[in-house]
Amino acid sequence: MDDGLVSWLVTISIGGVALIMRLWNLSYPSKLLFDETYYPKDAWTMLHQGYEGTWGDAKTINPQIAAGTSNGWTPDAEFVVHPPLGKELISIGEHLFGMTSFGWRFSSALFGTLMIVLTIRLARRLSR
């Protein structure tokens, strides 16, 4: 078998296992954890308003989001301390799967897997 074909089969196999491991039980726990209290909400408002909007008090809004309610934002702009790329990537998952724990974690799992695949291919290229 051709060495190039084998290397791609190994890369795809490792990438597939990595993706399955990342997606397995991704939605647990279903509540907002640590920085998730900021980024998924900012991504959701960017998806719907085009900019980061403000939300109500996290102690009342976060349980509502975990329960499936995603309309607690206001039209007021949020104070932004980070560039928008990460929130734009999170909004892809939210667009596909809704404002759910799986939705706001999906992009991180997908791009984390792509980094593994790219690292394998880069190592292969550099070590030939």
What are the residue ranges of the model-derived segments?
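Membrane-integral, polyisoprenol-dependent glycosyltransferases
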Residues: 1-128
